[in-house]
UniProtKB/Swiss-Prot annotation:
Primary localization class, coarse: mitochondrion
GO biological process: mitochondrial respiratory chain complex III assembly
Cellular component, GO annotation: mitochondrial inner membrane; mitochondrion
Species lineage: Eukaryota, Metazoa, Chordata, Craniata, Vertebrata
Compartments, as annotated in UniProt: Mitochondrion inner membrane
Keywords tagged on the record: Membrane, Mitochondrion, Mitochondrion inner membrane
Family according to the record: Belongs to the CBP3 family.
Protein name listed in UniProt: Ubiquinol-cytochrome-c reductase complex assembly factor 1
Cited function: Required for the assembly of the ubiquinol-cytochrome c reductase complex (mitochondrial respiratory chain complex III or cytochrome b-c1 complex). May be involved in cytochrome b translation and/or stability.
Entry-linked PANTHER family: UBIQUINOL-CYTOCHROME C REDUCTASE COMPLEX ASSEMBLY FACTOR 1 FAMILY MEMBER (PTHR12184), UBIQUINOL-CYTOCHROME-C REDUCTASE COMPLEX ASSEMBLY FACTOR 1 (PTHR12184:SF1)
Pfam families hit by this protein: Ubiq_cyt_C_chap
InterPro entries per record: Ubiq_cyt_c_chap, Ubiqinol_cyt_c_chaperone_CPB3
Length: 200
């Protein structure tokens, strides 16, 4: 059928789910914790860097859902740019400066996506380098911060992989794990049923 054939679900439902998923990226993240643990200033740019990391994790998950998932990815990103523009206007940034900032953010976003994609399929050193470049702006002298971020991304992507694709396409509902978590293994669903000694 090719790319132009009908999608598995109604396009409007997918767009609404995409907006909901993006909303989960901005409303369910503890930005103050990220700013504190990563020594980031409380600015629009820092907000954007943390948001784009979570948007990227959603894109990684939704690309696994075929054409409908890729269609949803377009609208997650579209929702992000609309939100960035609105936040800039609310902050009183003039239109020329905002346009230039958004152009710069677009370049940053696609460079980050490339780096994060490479990092997630590689080892922790590559992912740490991508986080250092893109989230921390090459300003981190504490390797424990990078270790925390690498662990966070790995556990979050692993958790998102356990979520049902059909539900994600229809609802866009995503729950985020805390940045600092005592037992990261607690997020994983058991891959096989567990039984006691009696086989129950």
């Amino acid at each position: 059928m090719g790319f132009t054939g009908p999608l598995k679900y109604n396009k409007w439902k997918i767009k609404i789910a995409a907006l909901r998923m993006y909303t989960c990226c901005v409303e369910r993240i503890d930005y103050d914790e990220f700013f504190e643990k990563c020594s980031l200033p409380d600015t629009l740019n820092s907000w954007f860097l943390v948001t784009q990391l979570h948007v990227w994790m959603c894109l990684v998950r939704m690309k696994q859902e075929g054409r409908a998932g890729k269609y949803m990815c377009r609208y997650i990103v579209h929702s992000m740019w609309e939100d960035v523009e609105q936040r800039g206007k609310v902050m009183g940034i003039d239109s020329v400066t905002l346009k230039n900032s958004m152009r710069s953010m677009t370049e940053i976003f696609y460079a980050a996506i490339f780096g994060y994609d490479e990092g997630i399929i590689s080892d922790d050193r590559i992912l740490a380098a991508a986080l250092w470049r893109n989230l921390l702006n090459k300003q981190c002298d504490d390797p424990r911060k990078l270790e925390l971020l690498v662990e966070y991304v790995r556990k979050q992507v692993q958790f998102l992989d356990t979520l049902d694709g059909e539900d994600l396409l229809l609802t866009g509902e995503v729950v985020w794990r805390p940045l600092v978590e005592k037992d990261a293994q607690s997020i994983l669903k058991p891959s096989t049923p567990t039984y006691n000694d009696e086989g129950l």
